[in-house]
Regions:
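Gly/serine-rich nucleotide phosphate-binding loop at the start of the catalytic core
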Residues: 1-65, 69-71
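Active-site-proximal, Lys/Arg-enriched surface segment
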Residues: 35, 63-148, 259-261
Length: 423
């Protein structure tokens, strides 16, 4: 006999009870999650109204109201930890996601870097902070914030990314805040403006990636001369060609791992550097990772940085490949990540966060049912289940009501016109 599965609605309902939202807002978010997963077309207010009991005006009104996304998604994480589907430790991954957008009236429309196309493209960008379980590599996005096209004088996008990261850290529940091992980002975030604020203001270590030509200096560990003047601090530049002054570590993969504590000139601090070298037939390939915590183990740095890549899964699950001229150049949505058609900043913020929360609820529901084995997750299958369940309930609601022939025909006509666009 097939066991009853845990639905995304059940996952969200339990989290809403502890998130401190008003009862009316809880009811609406549960309804919206159901419609979000059911909707086969574009995720906009008009289509949501076609499948649900509320009008598009109601959806537009709710999209203008603030939602504590960090607290709500943090509750999802804590709830999964209580159910032993996530471990009680994690990292905060930071990354920017490019969102294709056309037109000329959308707020903050500008040129942003698109990793898929390898160049800057006109559209939108969201900075996403994701909770990642480094053991199971399961991601739960905490919040996504739209990057403004124009910033105040003297402020760069790196400053904005750092502000978003710190705002998320300050909103974390104390129980979750104590579990954060580090903030992890790719090589773009290895900048003094970002790292210094995360370490000094956020009080968290940062794990990232460096360029192969990073300016690093060995620390001087020799005896003091006793002569007047400033003591010697450094002992030459770190070389990625000669590892004789590095500590070699045994590693199971087909690579060599070396580590050393050095001074980073660009970051203006001591860091633990880890060089992962893959030998090749012609030349070796080197990856330079680091942590601002000099006591962090090299194996931990590698594990945390590798876990960072799982934060791409919610972006992928919120989209589906769209073939354009024989190549995957653009992406469209399983969860409507770039289908918002509103021109209001508040509605855009609501839409982006709702799309990622829908993916999280779907992923956690399957993780709850597959806890005994590695997670096999398909957002397409989850949407199919949600639609089948929604349509079956509509059919059963007709069968359970005593009707005349005319009433039955009216109900059947209503069922067959579900989601149909007006002619």
């Amino acid at each position: 006999m097939r066991t009853q599965r845990t639905t995304p609605d059940q996952i969200l309902a339990a989290a809403l009870e502890h998130a401190g939202l008003r009862r009316t807002q809880q009811t609406y978010l549960r309804l919206l999650l159901t419609l979000w997963l059911v909707l086969p077309g574009r995720h906009n207010f008009t289509n949501l109204a076609r499948y649900g009991p509320t009008s598009d005006r109601t959806h537009r009104s709710w999209a203008q109201k603030p939602v504590p996304w960090v607290q709500l998604n943090s509750t999802l994480v804590l709830q999964a930890q209580d159910q032993q589907t996530l471990h009680r430790s994690g990292i905060l991954g930071v990354d920017a996601v490019f969102i294709p957008k056309y037109g000329s009236h959308t707020p903050d429309l500008a040129s942003y870097w698109s990793g898929c196309q390898g160049r800057s493209v006109r559209g939108l960008e969201g900075t996403c902070i994701t909770w990642i379980d480094p053991t199971t590599h399961q991601p739960v996005p905490l919040s996504i914030t739209q990057t403004p096209a124009e910033l105040p004088a003297g402020q760069s996008r790196v400053d904005f990314y750092a502000t978003v990261t710190l705002n998320t850290i300050t909103q974390l529940p104390e129980q979750l805040r104590k579990q954060v091992q580090a903030v992890v980002g790719d090589a773009y975030y290895t900048k003094l403006k970002f790292v210094a604020r995360v370490v000094n203001e956020g009080q968290l270590p940062f794990v990232g990636k460096m360029r192969k030509d990073a300016n690093l200096k060995h620390l001087f560990t020799g005896p003091r001369t006793g002569k007047p003047g400033r003591p010697r601090l450094y002992d030459g530049k770190v070389s990625l060609q000669d590892y004789s002054r590095w500590d070699a570590l045994p590693w199971a993969d087909e690579c060599m791992v070396y580590t050393v504590v050095a001074y980073s000139v660009s970051l203006k601090r001591q860091v633990r550097v880890v060089a992962v070298v893959w030998p090749g037939s012609r030349s070796s390939r080197t990856e330079v990772l680091f942590s601002t915590s000099t006591t962090m183990m090299a194996a931990t740095i590698i594990a945390l940085y590798r876990a960072r890549f799982s934060m791409e899964f919610p972006f992928r699950d919120g989209k589906r490949p769209s073939v354009l001229m024989g190549a995957v150049l653009a992406k469209k949505q399983f969860a409507g990540l770039s289908e918002c058609q509103s021109r209001q900043v508040e509605a855009l913020h609501f839409h982006l966060n709702m799309a990622l929360m829908a993916v999280s609820a779907a992923r956690l529901s399957q993780l709850h049912d597959q806890r005994a084995s590695p997670l096999v997750f398909s957002m397409e299958d989850e949407k199919r289940r949600a639609y089948n369940e929604f349509f079956a309930e509509r059919i059963l609601s007709i069968l359970t009501v005593e009707q005349t022939d005319q009433k039955r025909e009216d109900l059947l006509a209503d069922l067959l016109s579900l989601g149909v666009k007006a002619a």
